[in-house]
């Protein structure tokens, strides 16, 4: 499955954007999308048009309305799909059919069949797909990935990642959906960690995992529903091994069962050194290197932007104009989804499960890549 990138777009200048979904996460995106000079947000849409209107007025977006308003807007080239996960594929497919490139908030899809169908539809139409997470484009992870690709740790051999918390029900006012099909610690947080591992090692070849849940019922701890019980449908502790096409391997823990919170732990070990990466749920953070013979970590200053959500949309827009491949592709997101579904299948079967898809590591951003710089001038 390819991502169309062979020729520059026929349009010139700033890339037009339409946002579908005016919920809470839209604020995090619009904080950046409305300030990147290479983008122009023309419209925000939502099933609840009053929500779209309020968000448009908050950010000075000239137009708002229902979903069709964004899909049919003549100046919109990229749809930023911030709908609920269950609607991601439906909205993305409608956008592709309308001739729009699509950036989707994670998850790319809830299952292999619909995700693969979306990839095929976009490929046939010559449409680009991009998907969160784009945190690996931030200064922290880009600095670490450049060190790996430059050979500073030798040949990458192993990876370890950890995400452990007591679970979100103590602070989240409506946490039940995080314990249902398509969520849990694996599908909620796994994309950040597994995407980082794919960037470090390349495609995942096979996985093995075990999982468990300590409780069938949990209790909401805050907000208007405090004290209400809800059913836990998915494993809340997952321990997964992955082997990559390169021969490297990794071990990851994703848990809502730990009284002690430990998150953002990512270490990559090579033949010459171990690299400690920043939290893959963030765009910045320290990078530390421990070479053979060292007695302590050496901190490597992070270089590059750490603007936050929307950097993947901007990279997609600039790549669209240049006719080059963007980095946070739909293929990458589908491969991570495929790996997570395979992990779930391994928990059920007790065996290794092959990951059929592939997604090579993306090219690093140039060190002088600057979101705040206008690069797409009219007529250029």
Where are these regions (language model features)?
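Glycine- and charged-residue-rich phosphate/anionic-cofactor binding loop of Rossmann-like
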Residues: 40-42, 297-301, 319-336
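Predominantly a Rossmann-like dinucleotide-binding segment in NAD(P)-dependent oxidoreductases
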Residues: 135-231, 350
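N-terminal Rossmann-like dinucleotide-binding module
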Residues: 2-59, 377
């Amino acid at each position: 499955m390819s991502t169309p990138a062979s020729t520059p777009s026929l349009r010139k200048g700033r890339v037009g954007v339409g946002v579908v979904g005016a919920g809470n996460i839209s604020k995090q995106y619009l904080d950046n999308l409305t300030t990147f000079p290479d983008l122009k947000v023309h419209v925000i849409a939502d099933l609840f048009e009053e929500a779209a209107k309020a968000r448009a007025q908050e950010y000075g977006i000239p137009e708002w309305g229902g979903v069709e308003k964004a899909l049919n807007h003549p100046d919109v080239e990229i749809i930023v799909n911030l709908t609920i996960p269950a609607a991601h594929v439906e909205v993305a497919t409608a956008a592709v059919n309308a001739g729009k490139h699509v950036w989707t908030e994670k998850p790319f899809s809830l299952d292999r069949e619909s995700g693969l169908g979306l990839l095929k539809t976009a490929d046939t139409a010559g449409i680009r797909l991009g998907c969160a997470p784009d945190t690996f484009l931030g200064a922290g992870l880009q600095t670490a990935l450049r060190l790996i690709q430059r050979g500073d740790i030798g040949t990458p051999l192993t990876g370890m990642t950890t995400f452990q918390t007591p679970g979100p029900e103590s602070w989240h006012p409506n946490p039940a959906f995080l314990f249902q099909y398509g969520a849990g610690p694996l599908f909620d947080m796994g994309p950040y960690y597994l995407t980082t591992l794919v960037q470090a090692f390349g495609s995942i070849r096979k996985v093995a995992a075990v999982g468990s849940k300590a409780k069938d019922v949990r209790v909401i701890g805050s907000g208007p529903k405090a004290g209400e019980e809800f059913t836990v449908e998915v494993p809340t502790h997952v321990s997964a091994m992955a082997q990559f096409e390169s021969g490297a391997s990794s071990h990851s823990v994703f848990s809502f069962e730990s009284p002690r919170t430990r998150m953002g732990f990512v270490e990559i070990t090579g033949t010459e050194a171990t690299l400690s990466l920043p939290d893959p749920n963030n765009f910045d953070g320290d990078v530390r290197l421990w070479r053979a013979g060292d007695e302590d970590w050496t901190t490597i200053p992070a270089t590059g932007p750490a603007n936050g959500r929307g950097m993947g949309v901007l990279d997609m827009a600039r790549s669209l104009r240049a006719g080059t491949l963007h980095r946070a592709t739909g293929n990458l997101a589908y491969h991570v989804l495929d790996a997570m579904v395979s992990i779930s299948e391994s928990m059920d079967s007790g065996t290794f499960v092959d990951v059929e898809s592939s997604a090579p590591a993306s090219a690093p951003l140039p060190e002088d890549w600057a979101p705040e710089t206008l690069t797409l001038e009219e007529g250029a």
